Amino acid sequence: MLEDLLGVGEIYVDYEGGNPTGTHKDRIARAHVEKALEEGFSGITVGTCGNYGASIAYHAAIHGLRAVVFVPAGYTNARLPEMRSLGAEVVEVPGSYEDAVEASRHFALLTGFYDANPGSNREVDFKAYSDMAVGIASRVRPTAVFVPLGNGTTLSGLWKGFRGLGITPTMVGVTTAFGNEILRRFYGESEGDFAETVFNEPLVSERSFDAEEALEAIKESRGYVFGFPDDVALRYTELLRSTAGINPLPASALVLAGLVKFVRKFGITDGRFVLVVTGGVHVG
């Protein structure tokens, strides 16, 4: 149905909303908790805007591991009650998401907790997301893959996974127009607008911790980056609901907007296009 509507070849939706806490973050949270247990840590910590913290809290609770989650006090933080209900200790930090990450890293150094923050044990993240690529490749050999961009970790891990299989699809990052380092650097801008909202929260990142890897993946794959405002995210959320039968987070639904813009910009309509919808609306 989407193919007919957009006039393109084949569209495949890789939907991560069925994970325990509703997003792809469960993949890396599970991997980090398992690594923390293997290495004898008594606790795990992370700085987060929400989804990753909920995932860490969930998987830590399953394994009896103490979780301390740092969040930026000024953000919407809609998943705080869920984290607390799962037994995590939540610490609100003045400032930005990046400040919460730094506070968590400092806490890990002081207490000896496992540091699950982006950039701290990135090979664990990349391995978990490269497994997503294996799953996608078992269904289709993609021409282009559209991925939400926050820190750039997911796109980087997917590219590593595809490349390991000898597959080289065009990697297209899709993010908010109002605050993402990868978007800004892709277009050669030194500064950009920043506005965190309840819809773009998973994507805003003044400092994208895996920006170098993501930009390299985009360059190697001859990919691209697109940024969109919230109204576009909401419009494509409704379109995915009505055509694909899923209930995506607006930040994840932007991948469809990315596909539409990609087709219009480059005139590429024939091919196998994969939309990585990283999260769905979750009732915790």
Q: What is each stretch, according to the model?
A:
Residues 1-284:
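PLP-dependent amino-acid enzyme catalytic core
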